[in-house]
């Protein structure tokens, strides 16, 4: 089941207190980025955040499940109505995630 575009926009708006939120569509679902760092997924009208210890400490309810078949477990975030909670959770999660590697242009 694909995500409802209104739900995707709602998640973007709810997370905006954490930084610059962007999403990219990938195979019917959405990857969520904050300040250029991939931190979560929006799949089947569910919001998932990558598993980190700083994030676990702030979770109101720890629900681990894969967002799609064959994926690693993510935190399944049920309370998406609390904007401050989501922003705090993302801000705590980001420093524990690897930064994107800068791609170098190969010399020809």
Language-model features, listed with the residues they occupy:
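Charge-dense, helix-prone N-terminal extensions
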Residues: 1-108
């Amino acid at each position: 089941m694909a995500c409802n575009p209104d739900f995707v926009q709602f998640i973007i708006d709810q997370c905006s207190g954490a930084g610059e939120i962007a999403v990219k569509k990938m195979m019917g679902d959405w990857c969520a980025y904050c300040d250029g760092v991939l931190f979560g997924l929006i799949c089947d009208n569910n919001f998932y955040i990558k598993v980190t210890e700083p994030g676990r400490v702030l979770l109101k309810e720890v629900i681990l499940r894969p967002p799609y078949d064959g994926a690693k477990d993510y935190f399944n975030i049920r309370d998406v109505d609390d904007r401050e909670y989501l922003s705090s959770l993302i801000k705590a999660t980001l420093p524990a995630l690897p930064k994107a590697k800068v791609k170098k242009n190969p010399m020809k």
